[in-house]
Amino acid sequence: MRAIALPVKSLDEAKGRLARVLSPLERAALTLAMLEDVLDATLLLPGWETWVVSPDESVLEVAAGRGATPMPEEQPPLAQAIRQAEEEALSRGMDALAVLLPDTPLVTAAALTRAVHTLGPVVLAPAADETGTNL
């Protein structure tokens, strides 16, 4: 079995760089909408579980409601959430773990399928403008 982990900040902290243009409620709504878009893609991958790691109960409720496995984040920040998912994957004997930030735009099941079937111990997907990575 394999898993895709989606680490999500607390809705109170999410999309902080947009604080000057969006209210806290708008940032929370944007975060949840983007999470749902990514869940639409990840939940279509056969043989892959989707885990949502977050300290935010609302995020975990959305994840569970959509069919993903909610994982209460034990300790922020992002690197610790990823480490938590790695440890969980190891304890469950998973064959593979992918980490995908849930605010990655325009994710499709087809693109994820190509990425997760790429051979190699580590796969990075560069952003279209090559200023970062998305997977």
Feature-to-residue mapping (PLM):
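Acidic donor-binding segment of Leloir-type glycosyltransferases
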Residues: 46-70
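Active-site acidic Asp-centered loop
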Residues: 100-102
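Conserved donor-nucleotide/metal-binding helix-loop-beta segment in metal-dependent transferases, i.e.
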Residues: 104-132
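A short, N-terminal amphipathic alpha-helix
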Residues: 29-47
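Short phosphate-binding loop-to-helix
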Residues: 62-98
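Short, high-confidence coil segments that cap the C-terminus of an alpha-helix
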Residues: 47, 94, 119-121
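Hydrophobic targeting segments
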Residues: 3-6, 35, 50-51
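N-terminal nucleotide-binding beta1-loop-alpha1 segment
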Residues: 1-18
